[in-house]
């Protein structure tokens, strides 16, 4: 909800501001939307996460023990726990940075697969694997710790090295991951949220450029 709501707000703000109103450049639209999102949440880590780990150091003789106690005693979200325990900013940091995992990695893979004629389902799986490989997923960290995150990354790398959904070997390997992750209790919810953002931006940018071209044709004909 956070990521999608933010990107929708960013897209709306971009449209109203008309910063990209005259452009049918798909990449410019996507980067503009990401920048708007970053502007909306600028400073969110400092506002929401940093206060969680501020404490009177004179009262903390064992920082690690104190941190673990804080994580256990407070009603924190998975993202908040990960920041307190590992210093990972999670989705807040991703948004603050303009969704680089989406813009620079998942979206190019999704777009490339679609251009190859692959189905949306297969292209989305490949994009998800790319996200598994690079995202510090706080849901995984909360449930499986750093070992769980490392395992998911290793399996994603193995799947992509086999071609992902582009090749039979990769497809077979991906099929086995479903049961494997379920058995281990690993559910990369953060990556799933970023996949939704990836798909949204791909669809929105296609719609945007199509509409801009149509508007341009209408103006020429008139």
PLM ranges: what are they?
Residues 199:
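Active-site proximal loops enriched in glycine and acidic residues that flank catalytic Cys/His/Asp
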Residues 2-179, 183, 202-222:
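Phosphate-rich cofactor/ligand-interacting catalytic cores and adjacent structured alpha/beta frameworks
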């Amino acid at each position: 909800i956070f990521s999608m709501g933010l990107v929708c707000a960013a897209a709306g703000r971009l449209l109203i501001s008309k910063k990209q109103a005259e452009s049918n450049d798909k990449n410019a639209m996507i980067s503009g939307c990401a920048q708007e999102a970053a502007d909306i949440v600028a400073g969110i880590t400092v506002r929401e996460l940093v206060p969680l780990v501020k404490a009177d150091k004179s009262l903390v003789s064992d920082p690690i023990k104190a941190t673990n106690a804080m994580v256990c005693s407070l009603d924190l979200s998975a993202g908040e726990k990960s920041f307190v325990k590992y210093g990972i900013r999670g989705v807040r940091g991703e948004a603050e940075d303009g969704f680089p995992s989406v813009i620079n990695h998942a979206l190019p893979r999704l777009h490339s697969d679609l251009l190859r004629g692959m189905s949306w389902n297969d292209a989305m799986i490949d994009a998800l694997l790319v996200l598994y490989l690079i995202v510090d997923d706080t849901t995984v960290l909360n449930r499986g710790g750093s070992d769980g995150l490392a395992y998911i990354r290793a399996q994603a790398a193995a799947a992509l090295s086999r071609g992902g959904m582009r090749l039979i070997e990769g497809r077979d390997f991906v099929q086995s991951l479903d049961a494997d992750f379920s058995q281990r209790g690993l559910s990369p919810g953060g990556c799933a949220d970023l996949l939704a953002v990836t798909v949204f931006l791909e669809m929105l940018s296609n719609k945007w450029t199509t509409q801009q071209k149509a508007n341009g044709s209408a103006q020429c004909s008139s």
